[in-house]
């Protein structure tokens, strides 16, 4: 990639702010629906209907006329307007603080997540003590702002402890400040400012995540890894939706240069175009580029204005004349029945046309997702379902320069399993009155790495295949993962998903080295619509 010019980060942010606040006024929708699969599946009936042409694959959603009725119904679920007591209304019906005027709106809530559990296999007690907050609102119809923060302490089952201790990071959230102790300690925030100057354009600046796809997982860009600073522009042009996003990512494993031991950083540039060919059929094209901020000698490059290019990238050289990590992908969706859609993703990392569909070449790395999801299964109202298959070849997402691996804080930006796996997922959700029930089954087969060898599962390792490997899924220490989870919850307040929840989890990871089993039951008072993944 030819180097055009460089700008320091502070000047870029200042320039962005000037652009955002200088665009002319217009009335348009700017409010986001917080993304999590458990909230997202409640929109199945409205967004997968054959009479709607909603762009379903870019999340979080902006509330528009198609999903507004469903969203409002979710926020009013179980609300009893006859309750007059201020205390009772705040507990069951309303935000803790809620102000609505013609010029602006504002709300704020306290967000507890208090759980106690027992792992009967490991004979250990687990717990979660989270105190959080959220506040948000609108200014006119153009601006939306939101922030939340969480202070956490908790004890996890052994398999999650092993994960956290390995990378010193609580999955999808933040650094563990306990330094290897059994009780983990961490905190993190989410913040966004959304501005819609005209109906066709939304500009979002924040510290958040983005999800691309119609499935439970995404091989292209998922919400598994931790939050990152981002600037996201989304253009809605009828049947075509186009998104370009720039992100500032952390690499926790690259060699550090400064005396404070701060992580090295990298830039991410992402493009996604979704085309609703008809109400039933849509196709999308995805492109991502990861580039180091400084080379291995500590030479800082700044932000290359080439990354602002709205045109999709191909293989290129970054500002340091080092290869960037460039990925491409496709999405597809077809509504085979009303409220029922089949969907797919194809990820292409390294491409070798003569060996694309076989496993014989480690220079050919790709991934595939196929699935079906829908609402009102067997004509039962609010019985929603998903069946999904994912597979990613060894060494996909990795890079010859480890700092440009497709990760943030050492966690995959795609599937939590990384690469070198096959995965089957089934999920059922049912809601009746104030009760919600969820059941999930996962099966995965993958190849783990023996000591000092690289068989392609760990996307943080450099792209240096172990001699004799073929690129076949499952190479290495062949491992089977069986996972089952169920929850039953009673909704207390729909505004921030305050609920009592009973949960159970069975997990069995088995290979030639032995078996790691978990049998966990939890109960607690929970809130928020966060996605907190532990099904890996």
What are these model-derived regions, one by one?
Residues 25, 168-170, 226-228, 237-239, ...:
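Short, intrinsically disordered/low-complexity patches at protein termini
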Residues 1-32:
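Bacterial Sec-dependent N-terminal signal peptides
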Residues 4, 10-12, 186, 281-536:
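Exposed, low-structure sequence patches enriched in small/polar residues
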Residues 30-282, 287-293, 356-368, 373-391, ...:
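Outer-membrane beta-barrel channel domains
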């Amino acid at each position: 990639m030819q180097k055009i010019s460089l700008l320091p980060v502070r000047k870029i942010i200042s320039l962005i702010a000037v652009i955002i606040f200088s665009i002319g006024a217009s009335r348009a929708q700017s409010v986001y629906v917080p993304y999590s699969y458990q909230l997202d599946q409640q929109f199945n009936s409205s967004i997968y209907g054959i009479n709607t042409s909603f762009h379903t694959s870019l999340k979080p959603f902006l509330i528009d006329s198609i999903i507004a009725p469903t969203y409002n119904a979710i926020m009013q679920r179980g609300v009893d307007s006859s309750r007059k007591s201020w205390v009772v209304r705040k507990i069951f019906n309303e935000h803790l603080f809620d102000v609505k005027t013609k010029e602006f709106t504002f709300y704020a809530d306290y967000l507890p997540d208090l759980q106690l559990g027992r792992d009967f296999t490991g004979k250990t007690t687990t717990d979660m003590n989270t105190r959080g907050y959220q506040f948000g609102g609108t200014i006119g119809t153009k601006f939306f702002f939101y922030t939340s923060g969480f202070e956490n302490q908790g004890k996890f089952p052994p398999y999650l402890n092993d994960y956290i201790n390995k990378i010193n990071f609580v999955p999808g959230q933040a650094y563990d400040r306990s330094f290897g102790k059994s009780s983990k300690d961490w905190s993190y925030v989410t913040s966004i400012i959304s501005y819609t100057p005209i109906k066709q354009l939304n500009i979002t600046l924040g510290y958040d995540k983005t999800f691309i796809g119609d499935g439970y997982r995404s091989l292209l860009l998922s919400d598994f890894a931790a939050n990152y600073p981002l600037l996201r522009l989304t253009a809605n042009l009828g049947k075509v939706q186009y998104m370009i996003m720039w992100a500032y990512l952390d690499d926790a494993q690259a060699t550090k240069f400064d005396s404070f031991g701060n992580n090295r950083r990298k830039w991410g540039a992402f493009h996604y175009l979704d085309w609703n060919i008809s109400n039933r059929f849509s196709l999308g094209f995805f492109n991502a580029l990861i580039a180091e901020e400084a080379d291995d000698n500590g030479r800082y490059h700044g932000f290359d204005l080439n990354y602002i290019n709205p045109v999709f990238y191909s293989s290129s050289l970054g500002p340091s004349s080092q290869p960037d990590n460039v990925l491409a992908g496709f999405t597809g969706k077809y509504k085979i029945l009303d409220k029922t859609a089949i969907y797919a993703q194809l990820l292409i990392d390294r491409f070798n046309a003569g060996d694309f569909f076989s496993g014989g070449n480690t220079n050919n790395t790709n991934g595939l997702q196929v699935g079906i999801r829908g609402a009102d299964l067997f004509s039962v109202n609010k019985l929603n379902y998903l069946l999904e298959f994912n597979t990613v070849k060894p060494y996909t997402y990795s890079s010859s320069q480890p700092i440009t691996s497709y990760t943030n804080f050492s966690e995959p930006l795609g599937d939590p399993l990384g690469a070198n796996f096959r995965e089957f997922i089934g999920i059922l959700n049912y809601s009746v009155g104030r009760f919600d029930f969820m059941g999930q089954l996962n099966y995965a087969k993958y190849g783990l790495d023996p000591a000092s060898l690289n068989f392609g599962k760990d996307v943080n390792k450099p792209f240096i295949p172990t001699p004799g490997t073929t690129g076949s899924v499952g190479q290495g220490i062949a491992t089977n993962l069986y996972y089952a989870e169920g929850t039953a919850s009673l909704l207390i307040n729909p505004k921030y998903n305050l609920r009592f929840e009973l949960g159970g989890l069975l997990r069995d990871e088995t290979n030639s080295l032995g078996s790691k089993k978990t049998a966990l039951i939890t109960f607690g008072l929970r809130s928020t619509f966060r996605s907190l993944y532990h099904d890996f």
